[in-house]
Amino acid sequence: MKKILTTLIIILAAFTTTTFAQQQKGDVEFGIHVGYGGSNVSSSNLVNSSISSAFNAGIATDFYFSNRWSLKTKLIFDQKGWGSGFLATVDDQFITDFRLNYITLPVMANWHFGKKRNWYLNFGPYVGYLAGAKATDVSTDVKDYFHNTDFGLAAGIGTKIRLSNNLKLLIEYDAQEGFTDIFKENSGSAVRNSRASFNVGFNFILK
C-alpha cells in the first residue's frame, strides 16, 4: 500500500512540475464534471430542515480574455432540497426529505492565479429550471408547490492539473446560494436554496 501511494505522489508531482504554456486570450476550454455534496434551504422561520446529500453533473466552457481572466459557463443537472421537511396532505402530516432536481446555468467571471495560473476563483449569477420535485419518504410529486425558476449566486475555487497539452484534471469546491423564494405560496419568510459540492472532472483545450 505504501509503495502504491508513493508511486501516485511521484506521478502527480511529475504532472504538476511539467512545464506547459499558459492559456492566453482567445483560448477555449470545454469541461465535464461530476460532484457530490450537501444541500439545504435557508429561512428565518423554517422549523424543520437538515442537510440532504446532493449529486450534480455537468458540462462547462471557459473562454479566456487573458491568462488571468476568463468567462466560465456551466450547464448542470443539480440536485437540491433538504431533509426533515414538513409535508401536510388532506389525510395526514409527514416529516420527509424533499428532493428538487434543477437544470442550472451559471455564468461566472473566472480569475486564474498562482505561478502557473493553475488555480482559479469564480463567481457570478445562476438561473435554474426545476425539472422535478418529490417528497422522497412518501414518494409524492410536489413540483406544483415550487416555482419553476430559481435565481442566485454561484461561486467556486479549484485547481487544474495539466495532464497533457490538451487535457487538464479539474478538482474544485463550488457553492450556490439562492436569492428568491422557491415556494409559490408562502405566508412566512422566503425559503431559498443553498448547495455546496466537491467536483472532479476533465477540461479539454480546444484552442
Language-model segments: residues:
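Short glycine/proline- and aromatic-enriched beta-strand/turn motifs that initiate or cap beta-hairpins
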Residues: 20-63, 71, 203-207
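Outer-membrane beta-barrel channels and translocator barrels
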Residues: 25, 66, 114-116, 162-166, ...
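Residues that define the transmembrane beta-barrel architecture of outer-membrane proteins
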Residues: 26-28, 49-55, 99-103, 147-153, ...
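Transmembrane beta-strands of outer-membrane beta-barrel proteins
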Residues: 28-32, 71-73, 105, 119-127, ...
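Outer-membrane beta-barrel "beta-signal"
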Residues: 33, 161-163, 192-207
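Transmembrane beta-strands of outer-membrane beta-barrel pores
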Residues: 36-40, 77-81, 127-131, 175-181, ...
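Outer-membrane beta-barrel translocator domains and adjoining extracellular loop/strand segments
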Residues: 42-48, 83-90, 133-140, 182-188
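Residue-level signature of outer-membrane beta-barrel architecture
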Residues: 61-63, 111-113, 129, 159-161, ...
